[in-house]
């Protein structure tokens, strides 16, 4: 499993080792299983080597106060004190008083107290969590326990059991009240994020997009599901939150699935569409940012972030190339030597990450992984994966720092080429083949992209995308796109010209999403297209056959994107006419000897549930 990977066994002669039994998530029991199983493997990481964000805080003392944002995992909202003796609320970093959102933590006899930088003490008042300048000590003591929710993190409570854990009351959202609910609820789970990891921004006042059909925003995203910006080449893609301090390039490949091969099974066993990984690009030396804008240009299929800091204009550009099969990230600045970043690549499925710097002042980050799968007879055949990221700069230096990760110093510009792929093979009996070739394929892809160069890569991407996107045009009015997209949505009922443009923009966004999620491998876009930020997504982010997968393709024929139907149609033909499982479903479910059928919930391996 690589250098630095271990298994813990009762003794050296025992054939079993410590294992994550059943599902891989917080709160699962730890048991024993055969040595060599991927779910045994662990590494030892010191607290000082942990990357942002931390889950547990450093305890403050009078001489050394350490402040954190307390961030809810659902929605990424921050715990904020409001007025004196008022109920606390979830808040956005970019709305409100930062001193009300920063907290230091003290501990005594296993109980914890929280004081904001503005001097307000967290306390319990009836069924709510309040903050005030002064309170009776007995009301200010809380517990902290590790959550058993799949999100992973900490829950703050007034005891260690029962309906006593701080919760975003009536759902996640800015301005909600903080109350209490059962341990394990997704609205409870928090992490402690160091103050320097989040940077406040002020948005740009005027912005004229290069192209009319552009989604644009004046603050970073705080909620992945509702606010991230997706890019994709039809099979491999990424989502972008636009944070200036830690740029999270979360990426997916349509073929990375856990679960069962063929046959009907329970909802728990047919698997999940998985998060492939996260490339964290941390910009060092950050201070307050102005003129911030993030955007998704759907005319050219390119996303970006622009901002100003200390008089320097910074720009970040992102696109997913179909011709060159990779995601590309580029950083530039208006002054030379201003790009200073640290890279951390997170493998979300269990293998070590390798960081190397070559003699040409260029860096490569790689990892390999395996995902557990099981057939009807209980035999396990893993799906393998591999990822490579190539980092090149104009000027500056690239080194491995003391923590062993990649650091860029004093660059004029920086470009990253990223690819993750699996050994999924829809024509193979076990749906996989060629695992031993994956690392070489990933490396060849990013090296080929680097050799081609950024300008040629972007030109090829743009030509390829526009050959599809430009086939259809809908014009409902002559309106300039000079209003941020959230404001365009909120004013939809009030301005006829703007609401016509929103409909025009929405129409084209649907076509963009289909182009970005239905090319390459013969699999349809799933419930979330190709985008997914966790390993236990809603409805497994599956191929939902009652109506959802059909809806993905409603724009295909009417808007002249007919060939984007091919991955879906090829998937149906393969599973219905070539593979045996869907014909067996007709016998087992419909008690007929001819024809085929499929269940509502389906994975990519021909399996589905009895739901």
Locate predicted features.
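Aromatic-residue-lined binding/catalytic grooves and analogous aromatic/hydrophobic interfacial grooves
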Residues: 200-611
């Amino acid at each position: 499993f690589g250098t630095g990977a271990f298994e813990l066994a009762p003794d050296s002669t025992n054939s079993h080792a410590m294992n994550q039994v059943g599902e891989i998530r917080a709160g699962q029991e730890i048991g024993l299983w055969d040595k060599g199983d991927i779910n045994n493997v662990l590494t030892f990481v010191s607290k000082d080597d942990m990357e942002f964000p931390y889950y547990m805080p450093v305890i403050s003392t009078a001489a050394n106060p350490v402040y954190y944002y307390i961030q809810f995992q659902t929605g990424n909202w921050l715990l904020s004190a409001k007025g004196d003796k008022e109920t606390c609320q979830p808040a956005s970093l970019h709305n409100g008083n930062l001193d009300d959102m920063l907290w230091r933590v003290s501990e005594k006899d296993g109980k914890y107290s929280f004081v904001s930088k503005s001097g307000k003490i967290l306390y319990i008042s009836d069924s709510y969590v309040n903050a005030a300048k002064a309170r009776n000590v007995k009301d200010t003591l809380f517990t902290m326990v590790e959550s058993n929710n799949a999100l992973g993190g900490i829950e703050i409570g007034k005891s260690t059991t029962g309906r006593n854990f701080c919760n975003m009351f009536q759902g996640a959202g800015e301005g909600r009240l903080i109350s209490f609910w059962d341990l394990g609820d997704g609205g409870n789970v928090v992490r402690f994020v160091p103050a320097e990891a989040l940077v406040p921004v002020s948005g740009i006042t005027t912005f004229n997009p290069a192209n009319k059909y552009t989604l644009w925003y004046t603050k970073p995203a705080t909620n992945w599901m509702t606010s991230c910006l997706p890019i994709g080449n039809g099979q491999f893609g990424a989502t972008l939150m636009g944070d200036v301090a830690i740029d999270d390039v979360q990426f997916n490949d349509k073929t990375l699935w856990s679960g069962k091969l063929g046959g009907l099974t329970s909802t728990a066993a047919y698997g999940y569409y998985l998060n492939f990984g996260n490339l964290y690009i941390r910009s060092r030396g950050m201070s307050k940012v102005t003129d911030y804008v993030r955007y998704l240009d759907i005319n050219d299929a390119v996303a970006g972030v622009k901002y100003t800091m200390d008089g320097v204009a910074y720009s970040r550009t992102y696109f997913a190339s179909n011709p060159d099969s990779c995601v590309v990230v580029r950083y530039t600045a208006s002054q030379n030597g201003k790009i200073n970043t640290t890279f951390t690549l997170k493998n979300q499925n269990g293998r070590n990450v390798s960081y190397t710097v070559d003699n040409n002042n260029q860096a490569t980050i790689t990892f390999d992984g395996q995902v557990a799968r099981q057939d009807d007879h209980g035999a396990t055949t893993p799906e393998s994966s591999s990822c490579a990221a190539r980092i090149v700069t104009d000027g500056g230096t690239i080194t491995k720092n003391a923590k062993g990760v990649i650091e860029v110093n004093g660059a004029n510009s920086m470009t990253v080429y990223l690819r993750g792929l699996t050994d999924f093979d829809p024509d193979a009996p076990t749906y996989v083949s060629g695992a031993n070739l994956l690392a070489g394929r990933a490396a060849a892809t990013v090296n080929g992209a680097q050799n081609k160069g950024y300008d040629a890569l972007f030109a090829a991407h743009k030509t390829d995308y526009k050959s599809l996107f430009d086939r259809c045009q809908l014009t409902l009015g002559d309106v300039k796109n000079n209003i941020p997209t959230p404001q365009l949505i909120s004013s939809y009922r009030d301005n006829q010209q703007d609401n016509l443009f929103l409909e025009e923009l929405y129409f084209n966004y649907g076509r963009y999403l289909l182009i970005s999620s239905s090319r390459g491998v013969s699999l349809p876009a799933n419930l979330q297209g190709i985008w997914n930020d966790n390993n236990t997504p809603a409805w497994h982010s599956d191929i939902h056959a009652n109506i959802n997968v059909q809806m993905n393709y409603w724009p295909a024929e009417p808007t002249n994107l007919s060939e984007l139907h091919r991955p879906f149609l090829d998937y149906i033909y393969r599973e219905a006419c070539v593979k045996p499982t869907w014909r067996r479903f007709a016998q087992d479910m419909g008690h007929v000897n001819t024809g085929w059928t499929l269940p509502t919930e389906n994975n990519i391996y021909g399996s589905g549930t009895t739901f």
